[in-house]
Amino acid sequence: MPSTFESQLFFSRPFLSKRQIQRAQKNTISDYRNYNQKKLAVFKFLSDLCVQLKFPRKTLETAVYFYQRYHLFNRFETEVCYTVATSCLTLGCKEVETIKKTNDICTLSLRLRNVVKINTDILENFKKRVFQIELRILESCSFDYRVNNYVHIDEYVIKIGRELSFDYKLCNLAWVIAYDALKLETILVIPQHSIALAILKIAYELLDNKNWSSKRYSLFETDEKSVNEAYFDIVNFYINSFDMCDLQRHLPADLLPIGVERFMELKKNAGPESGLPQIPDHLLNADPYITITRDNNVQERRYVLSLELINGESSINSSTRHA
């Protein structure tokens, strides 16, 4: 009887549509409200870690991206979410080259969670769990380093703002908004430069500027649909969850207070919501990438960045079967 070798091949998809994300989460998240509440708590936890370890915001952004990608393909469990978050941060440090000893990160992580007596055994056991989760995080991203390897949202805000000759006041406001944007799943949907443009547009309008030009989008290799998707995500967040935002607590000193009414006005002036086209149900439910629960007992899983490799292997397998 011939032996069989089970193998899976995945094509990297660093960005997914909202409906694809929701479909993937059906397999991993039983209570989305609980997940979202805990995600905001984890975001604060990661922010506190980054502040105390003096990490730049790009490290936080990378860790948050990893955390949300992880839970697309791995079950959300309340009791281990802070361990997952710590693992995301240690991996994020390597990704964006903000190097810090794992001991320092793990020790501070335990302290922030009120672990009183941190001895060598507790620290080493925690580090083992953190390292074990790293592989799952990398697999959830298909080992694709392109997303977090280059320029990040806050950096794009400054670079694009300077390119468009926006003043310090506008860019500073946009930089604060960019922090709140990290709390959303938008970073799983839209590339960083498109999110940065949407944030600049919001800051531009909050300062009562008129006639924002969509002609700018082609200059920065994006399009109106992508920018609108991020724009409405962020505006809706401020309308629906203004009490959870950091903008109201960190508003630049030279600006008048901004309330939820201001964002409702922006949405009204923007007209009907628009954004990226959504995938129909029949295609969504036929997509194994998001519908099939990942089996960690499979003997081999491989990840590629090019469809040509998948098509080439399919052709070889087909030829072998018919030989």
From Swiss-Prot:
Pfam (any one): Cyclin_N
Cellular component GO terms, alphabetical: carboxy-terminal domain protein kinase complex; CTDK-1 complex; cyclin/CDK positive transcription elongation factor complex; cytosol; nucleolus; nucleoplasm; nucleus
Domain of life: Eukaryota
Keywords, alphabetical: Cyclin, DNA damage, mRNA processing, Nucleus, Phosphoprotein, Transcription, Ubl conjugation
InterPro entries xrefs: Cyclin-like_dom, Cyclin-like_sf, Cyclin/Ssn8, Cyclin_N
Subcellular location: Nucleus, Nucleolus
Any single biological process term in GO: positive regulation of DNA-templated transcription, elongation
Effect of inactivating the gene: Null mutants are viable, but grow more slowly than wild-type cells at 30 degrees Celsius. They are cold-sensitive, failing to grow at 12 degrees Celsius. They display flocculent growth in liquid media and they show abnormal cell morphologies, for example, a significant fraction of the cells are greatly enlarged. Deletion mutant is sensitive to the DNA synthesis inhibitor hydroxyurea (HU) and UV irradiation.
Any one GO molecular function term: cyclin-dependent protein serine/threonine kinase regulator activity
UniProt xrefs under SMART domains: CYCLIN
Gene3D superfamilies found in the cross-reference section: Cyclin-like
Role description: Cyclin subunit of the CTDK-I complex, which hyperphosphorylates the C-terminal heptapeptide repeat domain (CTD) of the largest RNA polymerase II subunit. CTDK-I phosphorylates 'Ser-5' if the CTD substrate is not phosphorylated at 'Ser-5', but will phosphorylate 'Ser-2' of a CTD substrate if 'Ser-5' is already phosphorylated. CTDK-I is also more reactive toward substrates that are prephosphorylated at 'Ser-2' or 'Ser-5' compared with an unphosphorylated CTD substrate, therefore efficiently creating doubly phosphorylated CTD repeats.
Other facts: Present with 1590 molecules/cell in log phase SD medium.
Quaternary state and interactors: CTDK-I consists of three subunits, CTK1, CTK2 and CTK3 (also called alpha, beta and gamma). Interacts with CTK1. Heterodimerization with CTK3 is required to protect this subunit from degradation.
Family: Belongs to the cyclin family.
Listed name of the protein: CTD kinase subunit beta
Organism: Saccharomyces cerevisiae (strain ATCC 204508 / S288c)
